[in-house]
Amino acid sequence: MVERKRWSENFSEWFNEVIEEAGILDKRYPVKGMNVWLPYGLKIMKNIEKFIHEEMERTGHQEVLFPALIPETEFKKEAEHIAGFEGEVFWITHAGHEPLDVKLILRPTSETAMYSMFALWIRSHADLPFKVYQIVNVYRYETKHTRPLIRVREISRFFEAHTAHADFEDAERQIKEDLEIFDNLMKRLAIAYIISKRPEWDKFPGAFYSLGAEVVMPDGRTLQIGTMHNYKQNFAKAYNILYEKEDGTHDYVHQTTFGMSERLLAAVIAIHGDDRGMVLPPTIAPIQVVIVPIPKKEKQEIVYEYAREIEEELRTAGIRVHLDMREKRPGWKFYDWELKGVPVRIEVGPRDVENSTVVLARRDKLEKITIKREELVDKVRELFDDIMKYLYERANEWLNSHIKRVETLEEAKKAFEDRRGIVEIPWCGEESCGLKMEEELDAKMLGIPYPEEKAKAPEGSRCPVCGRDAKFIARFARTY
């Protein structure tokens, strides 16, 4: 039976233990907020990134790789951007014993690194749209409590796509494409999420507007796992990114960005997990099927040979399979692979050899079935599909059960006491009322539902702060 008591009631402790015991990260590196990726965790993350690369290829983005150091002179060109990031920057002031003439920063994000180069590369309307991406390390001096994968000082798997366009309409088309890319990725991770348009006071520094994607974690807090920003011409004017139009005149490009990070893995671990550990979607599991032989001494070699044949059959079928031949008791192995979230476990003993059968155990539901050996490959693939469907349905049910619509601040406070996740409240649209609600609720405004046609407040609803007619539904949450 699947239990999720500790997973939800003591999530922070559960998460830290799983990260460590399942071999995702080692947190003991002697710089706070910087962690060491272990082989198993890195394999999962690279499997996620494989889908990102595929989507980038499909949509015509080209991969680039920029230096990690940015001169202070470039960083300071966009005033609003600096104001938003200056307090989080790691500065390099010396080279050896010599002070630098121009200080350098470790990139917190790459706008200020990339856009001076964009100004050299983009010349004509024929160069547009211009679409590049990279997956790199970025550095932010987080002053809040750091958490592995969630809030770190070195984001080591930071994906950022940067685009330039001839006009605002084409930039808007790019945002729609980013949302489609993100949705395709979430389907492969079986993750349910919401998209919100950030309030003016919480948009990305230098952006015209920002969108954020959130999931609800087991403790009811939300985690931002993706962002899309339309910069309009704000950065283009600061970095002089001009192009020649078809009529011979010049104009500044319109720009967008799209970002994700290892928080994607944090969401997978958190949302699909249970009290026994991780539950990995088959799409990203480094090992999709683990085979655990259960031999008796007198029939040990026969069982091992049968297990090897099964391993070879699955590998030939393109399934990521591992045969566990460690000298440990089967029960110990079951515990270990359940902790690591391997989607399907195969158990084979002497009786299976005699009857030409195989026992399949599902990690998601902790259920077992016995099948005929000749059904193996088809049945495993069928199980993968069923696991993906079940994980998504469970994640979607979790998300929807943790969004509550209320009318008053008192109802909102009660919802947060009950760890409801996301609370939706009518809002007049005034910043002062939004900030007052944040203060009263001790929560952050995520923004309004996106697309904006979903954000309109019901007829007759009132802003609970000023009492005026509400224009929007605003989402609030306690966040990571």
From Swiss-Prot:
GO MF term list: ATP binding; proline-tRNA ligase activity
SMART domains linked to this entry: ProRS-C_1
Any one GO CC term of the record: aminoacyl-tRNA synthetase multienzyme complex
Keyword Transmembrane: no
The keyword Cytoplasm is annotated on this UniProt entry: yes
Location in or out of the cell: Cytoplasm
Spans traversing the lipid bilayer: none
GO BP of this protein: prolyl-tRNA aminoacylation
Chemical reaction(s) catalysed: tRNA(Pro) + L-proline + ATP = L-prolyl-tRNA(Pro) + AMP + diphosphate
InterPro entries: aa-tRNA-synt_IIb (IPR002314), aa-tRNA-synth_II (IPR006195), aa-tRNA-synth_II/BPL/LPL (IPR045864), Anticodon-bd (IPR004154), Anticodon-bd_dom_sf (IPR036621), Pro-tRNA-ligase_IIa (IPR002316), Pro-tRNA-ligase_IIa_arc-type (IPR004499), Pro-tRNA_ligase_II_C (IPR016061)
EC class (word): ligase
Predominant location: cytoplasm
Keywords from the UniProt entry: Aminoacyl-tRNA synthetase, ATP-binding, Cytoplasm, Ligase, Nucleotide-binding, Protein biosynthesis
Subunit text: Homodimer.
Chain's role: Catalyzes the attachment of proline to tRNA(Pro) in a two-step reaction: proline is first activated by ATP to form Pro-AMP and then transferred to the acceptor end of tRNA(Pro).
Domain free text: Consists of three domains: the N-terminal catalytic domain, the anticodon-binding domain and the C-terminal extension.
Entry-linked HAMAP family: Pro_tRNA_synth_type3
Family the entry assigns: Belongs to the class-II aminoacyl-tRNA synthetase family. ProS type 3 subfamily.
Stated name of the protein: Proline--tRNA ligase
Species of provenance: Pyrococcus abyssi (strain GE5 / Orsay)
